[in-house]
Amino acid sequence: MKNRDSSFLGNKKVAVLMGGWSAEREISLRSGNAVLKSLKEMQINAKAIDLVSPEGSKLQLEDFDIAFIALHGRGGEDGFIQELLTDKEILFTGSKTEACKLAMNKVETKKVWREFSLPTPDFVEITKAGKSDMKITPFLSGSD
């Protein structure tokens, strides 16, 4: 691993947010632990925070200057944690709240792509459950 200068962080406390309550919890824990290991190797003051519920998230974020978001899926990529961190004035990695909310909404994201003439496959928005020969992907989650 190449040495990186982390002196700009000074004595800042970094929370590595991992786990979460989505179906992607296990991969998030692996990602978070890999990030934590790297930060510690760089002698950065980092601590793992395993978030298990939306309610608990609000309590566990005190006393940190920066959050490294290693959460996946709902709660981590949908704007929830970003909004919470923004409200608490904690700096964080990744996109801002509104970008996350938009990106997790597949239909709205495709509409934006089309607005900017970006190539994207045709799609149909289904608002009621019914039978279809199309593959249905979750609205606010991964693409199992």
Task: List the predicted regions and their residue ranges.
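Hydrophobic alpha-helical packing residues
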Residues: 39-40, 85, 113
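Active-site nucleotide/adenylate-binding loops and adjacent lid/helix of ATP-dependent enzymes
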Residues: 2-18, 102-144
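Short beta-strand elements in bilobed, periplasmic/extracellular small-molecule ligand-binding domains
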Residues: 43-49, 120
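Glycine- and acidic-residue-enriched helix-capping/strand-helix junction motifs
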Residues: 21-33, 38
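Eukaryote-biased intrinsically disordered, low-complexity acidic regions enriched in Ser/Thr/Pro
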Residues: 47-61
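Hydrophobic residues within alpha-helices
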Residues: 31-35, 81, 109
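A short, N-terminal amphipathic alpha-helix
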Residues: 34-45, 61
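A short, GP-enriched loop/loop-strand-helix hinge that lies immediately N-terminal to
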Residues: 17-21, 63-104, 119-127
